[in-house]
Regions:
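Short beta-strand elements
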Residues: 1-25, 36
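Extended extracellular/luminal ectodomain segments enriched in beta-structured repeat modules
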Residues: 39-49, 59
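Short beta-strands within extracellular/lumenal beta-sheet-rich domains
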Residues: 26-39, 99
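C-terminal outer-membrane/trafficking sorting elements
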Residues: 187-225
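Short, surface-exposed beta-strand/loop patches at domain edges
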Residues: 120-181
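Aromatic- and Gly/Pro-enriched, solvent-exposed loop/edge beta-strand patches characteristic
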Residues: 60-142
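Low-complexity, Pro/Thr/Ser/Gly/Ala-rich linker/spacer regions in secreted
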Residues: 2, 178-190
Length: 225
């Protein structure tokens, strides 16, 4: 739909709304919500653009995912191989009812003549739910897919506890973004998200965060002490 965006959904309606949504993470849900794209040129994927439903909870986490696809084998029979994923993205209040770009740490190489399954993955959480918008209908069965990562689907008793693929007819509002500027902007964000002082330190240090948010932090001593 532009020089950098590859999309299949119908976008929002005249009022700026999608025609539905799908939960990807919440108290009883951890789904991969994906759609299939065929490539007609070699490109580098820098991010996925997705519509965050206003039913989502600010603070919920999601991530962008890319699968390499074997179109001769169904997803359920092993036709998808996880190729890459982004770091976790925390939904903000400003993201609700809006499009957001979720960048990959490094560009993902995609090749002419190959098919890929791209989408958004959520996480089980007792209170923080994440919903992705839907707009339009599939052209064929298997064009859009759901992966129940932990077999949590209460409507599929036979596969309880078993990771399971399904197809659905609603089109995920997930788009490929090949804009090269996403790479540098993500790098800058990672560099300025916090400040550590004093440096050097005697073992006690202060971490000053750039904004109020939920963070996961790991401290490693590279000297092995």
């Amino acid at each position: 739909i532009s020089d950098y965006i590859y999309a299949k959904d119908n976008g929002t309606d005249i009022n700026g709304d999608p025609d539905g949504n799908w939960i990807v993470g919440g108290p009883d849900d951890q789904w991969h919500f994906t759609t299939r794209f065929e490539m007609y040129a070699d490109e580098q994927l820098t991010s996925l653009r997705t519509y965050i439903s206003d039913e989502s909870v600010a603070g919920a986490e999601i991530k962008a995912i890319v699968y390499e696809l074997d179109t001769t084998i169904s997803n359920a029979d092993g036709g998808v191989i996880l190729l890459n994923e982004s770091d976790n993205y925390t939904i903000t209040a400003q993201d609700l009812g809006a499009w957001v770009d979720i960048p990959f740490a490094d560009p993902v190489d995609l090749y002419n003549g190959y098919a890929y399954e791209v989408g958004i993955a959520g996480f089980v959480h007792p209170t923080d739910s994440a919903f992705i918008g839907t707009s339009g209908q599939s052209m064929y069965n298997g064009e859009h897919s759901l992966f129940d990562e932990f077999g949590l689907n209460p409507n599929d008793v036979a596969n309880q506890g078993i990771p399971t693929w399904y197809y659905l007819t609603r089109t995920p509002m997930v788009r490929m973004n090949f804009d090269p500027s996403n790479v540098s902007s993500f790098y800058d964000m990672k560099q300025t998200i916090f400040t550590i002082y004093p440096n050097p330190t005697n073992g006690i240090f202060i971490i000053e965060l750039g904004e109020v948010a939920k963070y996961d932090m790991t401290v490693n001593n590279v000297l092995g002490q």
